[in-house]
Amino acid sequence: MSIILIGFMGAGKSTVAKLLTENFTDLDQLIEEEIEMTIAEFFELFGEADFRKIENEVFELALQKNIIIATGGGIIENPKNLEALDREAGVVFLTADFETLWERISMDLQNVRPLAQDKKAAQLLFEKRKNDYAKVADLTIDVTDKSPEQIVEEIREKWGIN
């Protein structure tokens, strides 16, 4: 069974995936390998619509394996991805209040996030997406006051993962 981590930017999807297993798949990293540039560069050159098409193709390929997948925050923007998430078991929604997520995003200087350049726009995006995340989740974890290790333990308990 695949475990798929979803949630808004800054929720800790990649961090948690790394702690769950060494052999996790970071969807954003796979996409960057496929497009041979950063996601930020791709957004600037081709826009979000073209990015979402590639994201869907890479996601569908990743779903064919029994792996841990850390998705990008916008995975739910494509209806095809929403359908795929809805039919998959093991979808974990990592959530927190917007201010907590914004603080994390703002402190993360290693990741350029094209859709997080403006706080108000990011908050609107957060509000737009949060219900879709919740609809497809088999497990929702509020990460606000939890360490990555505590989150991993909850996931392991839910599915009996060692």
From Swiss-Prot:
It catalyses: shikimate + ATP = 3-phosphoshikimate + ADP + H(+). The keyword Nucleotide-binding applies. Keywords: Amino-acid biosynthesis, Aromatic amino acid biosynthesis, ATP-binding, Cytoplasm, Kinase, Magnesium, Metal-binding, Nucleotide-binding, Transferase. Binds 1 Mg(2+) ion per subunit. GO terms for biological process: amino acid biosynthetic process; aromatic amino acid family biosynthetic process; chorismate biosynthetic process. Its EC number is 2.7.1.71. Pfam families: SKI. Its main location: cytoplasm. Substrate binds at D28, R52, G73, R129. Monomer. Belongs to the shikimate kinase family. This is Shikimate kinase. It comes from Lactococcus lactis subsp. lactis (strain IL1403) (Streptococcus lactis). The lineage of its organism: Bacteria, Bacillati, Bacillota, Bacilli, Lactobacillales. The gene is aroK.
